[in-house]
Amino acid sequence: MSLFTTRPFRFLTICRIRKKPVLCNWELLLVNASPDNQELKARVEQETARDNRIKSIILTENKGISENTNAGVAVASGDFVSFFDHDDILEPDLLFSYAEAIENNDNVDLLYCDEDKLMPDGKLAQPFFKPDFNIDLLRNNNYICHMLTIRKSLLDTLQPNTKEFDGAQDHNLTLRAVEKARNVHHVAKVLYHWRLSETSTAANADSKPYATIAGIKAVQNHLDRLGLNAKVEQARRPFTYKVTYAVPDSHPLVSIIIPTKDHANILDNCITSIIEKSTYDNYELVIIENNSTENATFEYYDKLQAKYPDIVRLVTWEHEFNFSKLMNFGVARAKGNYLLLLNNDTEVITPNWIETMLGICAREDVGAVGAKLYYPDNTIQHAGLCVTGGVAGHLCQSMPKDNWGYFALNDAQQDFSAVTAACIMTKRSEYEKVGGFTEELQVAFNDVDFCLKLREINDLIVYTPEVELYHYESISRGVENNTNKQIRFHKEVAYMNYRWANYYVEGDPYINPNFTVGEPGNRYYHL
């Protein structure tokens, strides 16, 4: 722990961990970068004299947070090294909780916990209940943040932080560590209290403007080390970063597969938005006709194919509606190696939507990419799915479009267990590897099942809020309003509960267990 102009009364609160020990095998390294502060120096000497587990490293001058911290790491003798700020508070059982996790999994190389804020009046507020390890969220922002703990043997292999990363030193260190870590473990307890002060980013995002610049460099260097062709820039919020992955040099064909029945005006709205707004030009539109009866629909097909003969292809599915069979049928007839499954009742908002999704999907570790969808009234319809609390549910549903939600998570590119197939891109190779869509799931949950099959082979499911569409939900199909549909729906629920029983028992790793997940539209918000 680095000490610099630390107020002695705040320094005393740090010692809670010593005065109420739950675990005895620890050392506390105090790196004093304020050698001329006699009051602080005296307090440090007093504490080291009282407990030989507390040790001090006295620097001749303040070298900046990165190099000050390096001085402590250099003399650390523990198997794990934890990093925390000089004016915050730890829960007494923090070390025990970490040690328990390490004891249960000897492959753990990095640990982190949930946290909240310590207000000026001494009250605790704003708990941040974090997901389990989420590499894309970590590239968006340092959500791991405080009480980062790294195995010393791994830490010794990493290049130390330098001054250029001051302000984002923890983010840079975390990114370097996760590149090599065998296992990253999240302790889902609030064990760290971040003190709110005017000079802290907890209260004032403008207090450290240099931190954002350092953060951009940290994320960019991380991507470069991994050989990922991507550009990093500041996102819409302080200390968050927008990562744009480059489209493969081959400029691959993207097959946009759209099932439809009647409602030519709805399909036209979708097709027109694609053709007029899309900035990526190497795509085909595979329209799956399914039992339309309206003359206007077939007239529209003829007009569309005549106007765009090189883009539009019409294929016909003459059997009863089964979304999974429809998509498998369309994929088999598509020409592209990248598949963009799209509902006919959607409307493109973002011009570079295809290349944004394609850049992410082309990554070797990604199985599918989903988008942010809005209802016509500009409220959120989809910002990722949580697989818990029944079968699955949309996150942030019905929130206003411009509301970024709990810790702005619906505005962050990140990994989820599933995304909706109303707009989803995947590789043909991955689609075929997991057997496409499960045809027993005629209407509901086939997208969730597909994503979980990808997760089963360790593919990531990425949600990107940089791609936005409107979704005029269920216009073609209608709602589940008769007995036969409801019977079918309950069979699909039973299938999911049986097929993915272990997933439901263990819980969705991307959704913190402290959240209420049983109320549609409120996931992420009720505690």
Can you annotate each of these PLM segments?
Residues 59-76, 317-334, 352:
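Glycine-rich, basic loop-to-helix element that forms the pyrophosphate-binding segment
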Residues 1-207, 221:
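Nucleotide-sugar donor-binding/catalytic module of glycosyltransferases
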Residues 93-125, 197, 346-391:
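Conserved donor NDP-sugar-binding/catalytic core segment of glycosyltransferases
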Residues 18-58, 275-316:
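Acidic donor-binding segment of Leloir-type glycosyltransferases
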Residues 1-19, 220-276:
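N-proximal low-complexity "stem/linker" segments adjacent to membrane-targeting elements
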Residues 66, 74, 125-153, 166, ...:
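A recurrent flexible, glycine/aromatic-enriched loop bordering the glycosyltransferase active site
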Residues 208-251, 377, 389-416, 420, ...:
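C-terminal, non-catalytic tails of nucleotide-sugar-dependent glycosyltransferases
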Residues 154, 164-190, 219, 353-357, ...:
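A short, conserved alpha-helix in the catalytic core of glycosyltransferases
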